Regions:
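N-terminal signal-anchor module of multipass membrane proteins
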Residues: 1-59, 306, 316-317
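Membrane-interface helix-boundary motifs at transmembrane edges
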Residues: 7, 71-82, 104, 132-142, ...
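Alpha-helical transmembrane segments
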Residues: 13-30, 86-94, 148-154, 282
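C-terminal ends of transmembrane alpha-helices
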Residues: 31-36, 124-128, 152-170, 194-198, ...
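Central hydrophobic cores of alpha-helical transmembrane segments in multi-pass inner-membrane proteins
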Residues: 51-71, 120-126
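Membrane-interface helix-loop-helix junctions at boundaries between adjacent transmembrane segments
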Residues: 76, 80, 97-178
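Predominantly late transmembrane helices and immediately cytosolic-facing juxtamembrane segments
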Residues: 127-131, 236-259
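Extracellular/periplasmic helix-loop-helix junctions in multi-pass membrane proteins
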Residues: 169-176, 226-234, 262, 286-304
Length: 333
């Protein structure tokens, strides 16, 4: 535990517990296959959890909004302005080109770029936390593990969403989705070996479990997708990633409020540890709901894309080392 008793820590055991969604997903698949004759798959479960109104309200965009609210402090914006401003212009041009360029090619290219950035962001977060909980620096083995996971994740992502956004894909006369499945299988096989080697070298027990949890997340996603349960493939990483992100943002806001000064979101609210726990998710969900309600309008749709790209971008550096934000977040191993 950090020596400052006023500092709240993100509990690594809680983050590891989120991965229980993996065995629970296999239990659902087993029950549906062996007992219910796939009634859930063919009759009750949608292909995408976003078809559930409550899920669409709580997951996806809200954690991106929460990240923006946490970063929108005046001191942080002043500190990072020369990294954020040029990037925002570049990503705005990417969004406009994808939205208004020659169709369907422009939107398909935008999808591939978005898919790659999404997978890179999600896995960089989860694998980075594995590194923190392991108490080690990123070496050659970790980098191999990370990129095997990213390539596996990208292939799985294209298998899940490609039909919706790309349509039929043929590569050198070969069905593209069969090729994606082959690539995902090969990278998952490599991931098993790399995960075993990385976990073996880890001295921290919690870090070792977290390394295995992340390796198994991708392997499980590939296996469950091959069984046809697309909903669970989307649900597992989304639930883990979003709840992990909210845990970090709430911890940051609480510690900053208690130790230094409250951000603009909390300035007129009671100064106690529970305020960010309630206010940040509530404000994020409300703003995300408003944006999603009007996303059919080009301006709102582009705004959602832009803030998503910017979220992926700034999350790559604002929590590294002893950055201004990272000073308010510690992990308990």
């Amino acid at each position: 535990v950090h020596p400052d008793s006023s500092l709240h820590c993100v509990d690594g055991r809680w983050l590891l517990a989120l991965y229980c969604v993996i065995p629970l997903s296999f239990i659902v698949v087993a029950l549906d296959t062996l007992v219910l004759q796939r009634t859930l798959l063919h009759g009750l479960l949608p292909d995408d959890p976003n078809d559930w109104a409550l899920w669409a309200l709580l997951f996806g965009l809200p954690h991106i909004i929460a990240s923006a609210l946490t970063l929108s402090d005046r001191d942080y914006l002043r500190h990072y302005r020369w990294r954020l401003l040029p990037a925002s212009l570049v990503f705005l041009l990417v969004c406009l080109a994808g939205w208004y360029g020659p169709q369907p090619l422009s939107y398909q290219l935008l999808f591939v770029f978005f898919a790659g950035f999404t997978v890179f962001h999600v896995l960089s977060q989860q694998l980075g936390i594995a590194l923190v909980l392991s108490g080690r620096r990123p070496g050659r083995l970790f980098r191999l593990w990370k990129w095997a996971a990213i390539f596996a994740g990208m292939a799985i992502y294209l298998m899940v969403y490609g039909g919706q956004y790309l349509g039929r894909v043929q590569l050198a006369g070969i069905d593209g989705y069969r090729l994606f499945a082959l690539l995902a299988g090969c990278f998952c096989a490599a991931l098993i070996l790399l995960t075993w080697q990385l976990a073996r070298d880890c001295e921290e027990r919690l870090g070792r479990w977290f390394i295995w949890a992340n390796g198994l997340l991708l392997i499980s996603a590939f296996a469950i997708n091959e069984l046809g349960y697309t909903l669970l493939v989307i649900l597992m990483p989304r639930l883990i990633h979003d709840l992990t992100a909210f845990s970090v943002y709430i911890t940051h806001d609480r510690n900053r409020q208690v130790r230094t000064s409250a951000g603009w979101l909390y300035r007129w609210l009671p100064s106690n540890g529970m305020t960010p726990f309630v206010v940040l998710p509530a404000a994020s969900i409300l703003i995300a709901w408003l944006l999603n309600s009007y996303q059919q309008h080009a301006f709102i749709g582009i705004a959602i894309l832009l803030i998503s790209f910017m979220h992926y971008y700034w999350e790559g550096f604002v929590w590294r080392g002893e950055s201004p934000l990272r000073q308010h977040v510690r992990f308990r191993r």
